[in-house]
Amino acid sequence: MIYAGILAGGIGSRMGNVPLPKQFLDIDNKPILIHTIEKFILVSEFNEIIIATPAQWISHTQDILKKYNITDQRVKVVAGGTDRNETIMNIIDYIRNVNGINNDDVIVTHDAVRPFLTQRIIKENIEVAEKYGAVDTVIEAIDTIVMSKDKQNIHSIPVRNEMYQGQTPQSFNIKLLQDSYRALSSAQKEILSDACKIIVESGHPVKLVRGELYNIKVTTPYDLKVANAIIQGDIADD
């Protein structure tokens, strides 16, 4: 089976003094989360589309789904965890408890606050994850990346054409991700906050799918302005 895991567990502290977590803020008069969910509903390959949100915001999430006529029976809401990977594991726990987990099951995990992903990106994630077990969505780095260990001096400058900026979705064979996560120590779980990094550290290759420059993560007030400009300028592909 193929699952979507929409990661809406953040509280949006970088957004500043706002009344709601960032995933519930509006762009073009509609919550960011709804824009994102609508992209996933269009993909018939998904058996279930699971939203993980803070426990105290589950009722609000269900209310906005009703308000914006998200009636697709594949859409479920579960409680997120204390961090990103725990949120993904909560989704996997839900899958295991409801359907069980088969060897070829795939999960496409995606930031709820990246509302501009395309059908191509989603479908390529599914295809590559089914074939290879793990995939990250990336774009080539445009700017030169510098590394500093003390935040004052440059210590190295990586070769730019080897650098990529990670986006989401990140997609996995569920058993591969679950087993790799369970093999981590508590200390490793604190450090390895990215699911793809967990797979890389396990020794399993992670394939790349081409993202889009406009597949932005809306985390700051500036991002919110950019997101509205993307919609109003009809920049993003369908």
Curated annotation (Swiss-Prot):
Its EC number is 2.7.7.40. The record marks 14, 22 as: Transition state stabilizer. GO terms for biological process: cell wall organization; isoprenoid biosynthetic process; poly(ribitol phosphate) teichoic acid biosynthetic process. The record marks 160, 217 as: Positions ribitol 5-phosphate for the nucleophilic attack. The keyword Nucleotidyltransferase applies. Keywords: Cell wall biogenesis/degradation, Nucleotidyltransferase, Teichoic acid biosynthesis, Transferase. Disulfide bonds: none annotated. Pathway: Cell wall biogenesis; poly(ribitol phosphate) teichoic acid biosynthesis. It catalyses: D-ribitol 5-phosphate + CTP + H(+) = CDP-L-ribitol + diphosphate. GO terms for molecular function: 2-C-methyl-D-erythritol 4-phosphate cytidylyltransferase activity; D-ribitol-5-phosphate cytidylyltransferase activity. CTP binds at residues 7-10, 81-87. It comes from the Bacteria. It is an enzyme of class 2 (transferase). Catalyzes the transfer of the cytidylyl group of CTP to D-ribitol 5-phosphate. Belongs to the IspD/TarI cytidylyltransferase family. TarI subfamily. NCBIfam families: PRK00155.1-3, PRK13385.1. This is Ribitol-5-phosphate cytidylyltransferase 2.
